[in-house]
Amino acid sequence: YKRQIYFASLGISGYLAYYFIDSYLCLIFFFIYGTIWAFSVSNWHETVHRTAFKTRWLNEIVYHISCFMGDFEAYRWRWSHTFHHSNTYQTKDDYDHDIQITRPTELLAFFLNFIPFADLLFPHKLLKYEIIKNSFRKLSPVIAITAPDSEKNKIVWNSRFYVFLWLVIIAYSFWIGSILPVIYILLPNYYGKPIQFFVNVTQHLGAPFDKKDHRESTYSVKINPIFAFLYCCLLYTSDA
């Protein structure tokens, strides 16, 4: 029922943004809507581990929906996340592509995460850009490291499916003469990211480097109930 509340909250905030479209209030509700949308990354994380629901098929459905929402191509990220859990903070040899903060830390890029739309200043770093490249079979290095050859065609064709849906949304916006479909579906990750990033970046804070023993990578955080709900209550964790 918690994920039902999540999607209901997304729908209600989206409706209120549209209802107040002629008022500055719409900016507040779009920010709320974008923030809830951006937290789809938490749904993605719990469903890839199949801990959100009791049944595998329901986890799989919500996983694919959340992947599309968060620009996480489903097959690429299933394998890269498996690789991520083979180690703690991995700094040697093959790099862990699931870690949000680079080493050495790019401070400008880090702080820009707290500014809406700042990601668009670096289009070559966007997940959408990676998906577009993958759709042309120009597979990213992380795929070569983590995904078996048998999965690469799935990554290519699913990337093409994502790009097709994006083009349909853009074409529909032109057809109806409104940018709203783009604002509602293609841009929320960019204007709704600041709070989501602030919460999500706690996920690996304090983890030791290059340790196979995941018992050394436990952590606890405390956040308010609303953010905890959006974060799927990922507050007490062993990174295993």
Where on the chain are the PLM-derived regions?
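Catalytic core of nucleotide-sugar-dependent glycosyltransferases
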Residues: S80-H84, V201, D213
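Cytosolic juxtamembrane regulatory segments of multi-pass membrane proteins
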Residues: T218-L234
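Membrane-anchoring hydrophobic segments
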Residues: R50-T51, R56
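Membrane-cytosol interface motif
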Residues: Y63, H214-V221
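His-Asp-centered metal-binding catalytic motifs of divalent-metal-dependent phosphohydrolases/nucleases
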Residues: W44-R50
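Non-catalytic, topology-defining segments of multipass membrane proteins
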Residues: Y1-I36, N43, E60, F68-L186, ...
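Transmembrane alpha-helical segments that form the membrane-embedded catalytic/substrate-channel core
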Residues: T35-W44, E73, L186-D210
